[in-house]
Amino acid sequence: MSYVSGFHHITLCAGGAQEDIDFFTRVVGQRMIKQTVLFDGRYAHYHLYYSNANAEPGSVMTTFPYNRVPGRPGSGQVSSSAYTIPKGSVTFWEEHLDRYKVPHGGIQERFGQKYIRFSHPSGLQFDAIEEGADTRVGWVTGEIKSDTAMKGFSGTVLSVREVAETERFFIEALGFKKTGIDGNLHRFEIGAGGPNRTVILQHDPDRPSGSWTFGAGTAHHMALDVGTDENLAKQKDLYEELGYTDTSEIKDRNYFHSIYTRCPGGILVECAATAVGGFARDEDPKRLGFQLLLPPWFEEKRKEIEAMLEPIQVPESNRAEGHAEAILADVNKAAVAEANQAAQGKFSHRASGNEFVGGDKR
């Protein structure tokens, strides 16, 4: 049985924080919905979140600006993250990318769909792929209108040296089905397929393995949505039943709870269940992303953490006021408090007493 409904988020390692914010808010045209920090390790790094108008799972791109260490792109990684764009808008995106002098590969086609691949300043790769069946609401900017805005994810392209065992993992452990082959690309879809439900394995038999550690210019993991904490526990049981016993404990990521495992091809796959209140559980839905928010177990370290982070500026266009498409509702704070209380001691997270030894700023 599959507990996966589609993508939840994708997490990448970028370079500078301000460079990353400018790229996603101006070039990609996403709404910055959260600035927090990496919850693991002794170094203070931002964890930045971007999304469509409604901050919904399946549109959320998250990044760790990681200037300290460069990553090594290669096989065993997400090689490209794919967004959907409205049918007929790929020409706009080619012109838009040219206007910002963003490197791209021109208009291409795979599985009968037009797309354009483009690059982040740190070298990360993205696809904007035409999709007529996506009803999600994109974030509108001064340059990107509703008929061209990115809606959310189509899915990911994963680079693997061998296909067979990774294919088995996605089918048996996650419930995907194989729906097509186009050259060295093997397409898998969950449920009805289409937007937010597509994974493509790119067979790269001679490509050296990429790095697995945090490092600028590489993808860290892809996260799939399992809906509820109950399903998350069942997915962990399924992994272990199938022999994937290196699955992590259930972790508290504040905005969601999750487990991690590496598939046979090397890609880190997270399964996630959104926490009560989602990405608006700790700030005004109309002003998401404007302040540094820390989980309760890091608050006592706030001044220390802030001193280690690069100063950043969020564009005023990030405000939801005046955006009719941004319909994220106010959150029941009492329900969030109750959920936080219930989660205490139930999920794993780093102890607040651990010392930070550095960050991107020093």
Predicted regions, residues:
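Vicinal oxygen chelate
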Residues: 1, 6-15, 34-36, 59, 66-151, 180-201, ...
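Active-site-proximal cofactor/substrate-binding loop regions of enzyme domains
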Residues: 2-74, 87-103
